[in-house]
From Swiss-Prot:
Component of the acetyl coenzyme A carboxylase (ACC) complex. First, biotin carboxylase catalyzes the carboxylation of biotin on its carrier protein (BCCP) and then the CO(2) group is transferred by the carboxyltransferase to acetyl-CoA to form malonyl-CoA. It is an enzyme of class 2 (transferase). GO terms for molecular function: acetyl-CoA carboxylase activity; ATP binding; carboxyl- or carbamoyltransferase activity. This is Acetyl-coenzyme A carboxylase carboxyl transferase subunit alpha. NCBIfam families: accA, AccA_sub, PRK05724.1. Pathway: Lipid metabolism; malonyl-CoA biosynthesis; malonyl-CoA from acetyl-CoA: step 1/1. Its EC number is 2.1.3.15. Its main location: cytoplasm. It holds the Pfam family ACCA. It is found in: Cytoplasm. It catalyses: N(6)-carboxybiotinyl-L-lysyl-[protein] + acetyl-CoA = N(6)-biotinyl-L-lysyl-[protein] + malonyl-CoA. Acetyl-CoA carboxylase is a heterohexamer composed of biotin carboxyl carrier protein (AccB), biotin carboxylase (AccC) and two subunits each of ACCase subunit alpha (AccA) and ACCase subunit beta (AccD).
């Protein structure tokens, strides 16, 4: 099966394979088969619309983890200019699972921070599969405090299965690093806009997700635990992951209904990986609009609204 397609997209993959076969036949035999190709393309588009119009929570979770889905560095490339990455937590080391630095959004200087996974095996290992250690969160905290000093808005991109649970991370006080970030972000006197671009996994996501505006891409997820983890606890088997995903309410649409998410950013048909540039433009427009809405607030009003927003969780 084509690695660009997930299991539930198999009918679409089959049609695309037929289209590619016809293109090869046309190249080899100089036959005019454009009408048949056009018909199959229309059929593929309609089938894609049908499948993606009825996705389950578990299928959305699979899309959120798609290996070709745009990551933080992809959005940095498409949306921002003059990005200058900053490294290290000034306590232990640098953590490549979190990237951050100063950049410009249009002409506005901002601080950008986000989880970063990896494409190939070497990069996945270097980025620890997007699971930060304590030094990653301490680096993020250092950059956020720097942003406050220089009066820069903070934009965070969330995409992690969770904070790294290894022994070395626990030895360096993973829980304290996350808790400290929550405390600091709640008090920062500068606008914070967070966007879930893939997986929003538990405290590992929340550690850069305390904000004034929270966005989720249409096929992203946000939850206290993975569906597999929840199923393993409740039913003693990860095979019930689909049931767990449905019960947990992990999707952007459901979290918007609950009042946790401020805006759901639409994705191209088939998911963000089908057209990263279009997805990035949608994110850019959303960020610009939200920063504009926050620009006129003084520090006290900003903190008061942030506090009220956090306290409203669970009231919907």
């Amino acid at each position: 099966m084509n690695p660009n397609f997930l299991d539930f997209e198999q009918p679409i993959a089959d049609l695309q394979a037929k289209i590619e076969e016809l293109r090869l036949v046309g190249d080899d035999n100089a036959l005019n088969i454009s009408d048949e190709i056009s018909r199959l393309q229309d059929k593929s588009h309609a089938l894609t619309a049908s499948i993606f119009g009825n996705l389950t929570s578990w299928q959305i979770a699979q899309l959120a983890r798609h290996p070709r889905r745009p990551y933080t560095l992809d959005y940095l490339e498409h949306i921002f200019t003059e990005f200058e990455e900053l490294h290290g937590d000034r306590h232990f080391t640098d953590d490549a699972a979190i990237v951050g630095g100063v950049a410009r959004l249009d002409d506005q200087p901002v601080m950008v921070i986000g989880h970063q996974k990896g494409r190939d095996v070497r990069e996945k290992v270097r980025r620890n599969f997007g699971m930060p250690r304590p030094e990653g969160y301490r680096k993020a905290c250092r950059l956020m405090e720097m942003a406050e000093r220089f009066k820069l808005p903070i934009l965070t991109f969330i995409d992690t299965p969770g904070a790294y649970p290894g022994i070395d991370a626990e030895e360096r006080n993973q829980s304290e690093a996350i808790a400290w970030n929550l405390r600091v972000m709640a008090r920062l006197k500068t606008p914070i806009v967070s966007t879930v671009i893939g997986e929003g996994g538990s405290g590992g996501a929340l550690a850069i997700g305390v904000c004034d505006r929270l966005n989720m891409l249409q096929y992203s997820t946000y939850a206290v635990i993975s569906p597999e983890g929840c199923a393993s606890i409740l039913w003693r088997t990860a095979e019930k992951a689909a049931d767990a995903a449905e019960a947990m309410g992990i999707t952007a649409a459901r979290l918007r209904e609950l009042g946790i998410v401020d805006e759901v950013i639409g994705e191209p048909l088939g998911g963000a990986h089908r057209n990263p540039a279009a997805t990035a433009e949608s994110v850019r427009q959303t960020l610009l609009a939200q920063l504009e809405s926050l620009r006129g607030l003084d520090a006290d009003s900003l903190l008061e609204q942030r506090y009220e927003r956090l306290m409203s969780y669970g009231r919907a």
